[in-house]
Design a protein with these regions (language model features):
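Bacterial N-terminal signal peptides
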Residues: 6-19
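A domain-start/cap signature at the N-terminus of enzymes
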Residues: 22-75, 107, 146, 154, ...
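Serine-hydrolase catalytic machinery in alpha/beta-hydrolase-like enzymes
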Residues: 45-58, 70-170
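Alpha/beta-hydrolase fold active-site loops
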Residues: 74, 106, 200, 223-224
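The feature captures the conserved acid-bearing segment of alpha/beta-hydrolase catalytic domains
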Residues: 201-275
């Protein structure tokens, strides 16, 4: 198993969840597939055994049908929003994400996140958008031990799926991208700061769940970020505009785009631009990845 991932798993669960085991299924998956034929391509609904809880966890992936079975493809970890699941966004707009993944040559991984409202480790939700520090503080104070455990498991679960698929398909660790919508956008901001060395770039969509008082901005200073929002997506719109101003004034590697859509309809509007952004970042000299 990748040493970097093992350390991440131990850090998450050892600190936040006490006695829960931190063993990843990625190593077992890798060993089992050592003599297996090339893994399948196309659209796939899959599941795996999540060792910390002993549960089968679903995830969905799309692998370009043009893959030759050997090339190290770039990979996108996408985090769904509240009320959705691992399947939802890959079906939107007649499968737009799948079409773009095929066209641009990316693997797309969409995990559940342990529970539908697991939130990938980020405890913030509406109205705690950027600039609403009082709401953020109140939400953090209200997190119970059970919820803290669920948040930690959600974070670990998506990182486990990413590692599993990366190993199985030999994906390019130097071109690993992170994106998410709404609750998933909050997860993207959270994971960007937790593992800044893991990502080539990040694309949060309509979910500025970032606490100005506590977020470790210096950890993402060198990370390219493309944030998108819909002009009809209040109350997240005001938070996104405030966060965009903060990022620009701070000279971060940051781009911001607003489209004429609401909180949900903006997603298919921005996906083509997100893949174009990832392509542009990929064309730069990549950083080393663990």
């Amino acid at each position: 198993m990748n040493r970097y991932f093992a350390l991440c798993a131990c850090a998450i669960l050892g600190v936040a969840t006490g006695s829960i085991g931190a063993q990843s299924p990625a190593a077992a998956q890798s060993a089992q597939s050592a003599t297996a034929p090339a893994p399948p391509v196309g659209d796939q609904n899959r599941q795996y055994l999540f060792a910390p809880t002993g549960e089968q966890m679903p995830y969905r992936i799309y692998v370009p049908t043009s893959w030759d079975g050997e090339s190290a493809l770039p990979i996108v970890l996408f985090l769904h929003g509240a009320g959705a699941n691992e399947r939802t966004y890959l079906d939107q707009a007649d499968g737009l994400v799948r079409m773009l993944a095929e066209q641009h040559g990316y693997i797309v991984v969409s995990p559940l996140g342990f529970r539908p409202l697991g939130a990938y480790g980020n405890p913030l939700r509406l109205p705690a958008v950027f600039g609403e520090s009082a709401a953020a503080a109140a939400q953090r104070a209200a997190v119970t031990p059970a919820r803290r455990r669920e948040l930690a498991l959600s974070e670990l679960e998506v990182m486990t799926v990413l590692e599993l698929v990366t190993e199985r398909y030999g994906a390019d660790r130097a071109r690993t991208f992170l994106a998410g919508h709404s609750m998933g956008s909050g997860g993207a901001w959270h994971l960007a700061a937790r593992y800044p060395e893991r990502w080539r770039a990040v694309a949060p969509m309509s979910g500025p769940f970032v606490d100005a008082a506590t977020y470790p901005f210096e950890r993402i200073r060198d990370l390219p970020i493309f944030m998108t929002e819909g002009t009809g997506a209040e109350p997240s719109l005001s938070g996104s505009r405030a966060l965009a101003e903060f990022m620009r004034n701070g000279d971060f590697r940051f781009e911001y785009l607003e489209v004429d859509g609401n909180h949900g309809s903006m997603v298919p509007m921005v996906w083509p631009r997100v893949f174009e952004f990832f392509d542009a970042v990929s064309a730069d000299q990549p950083r080393n990845r663990p």
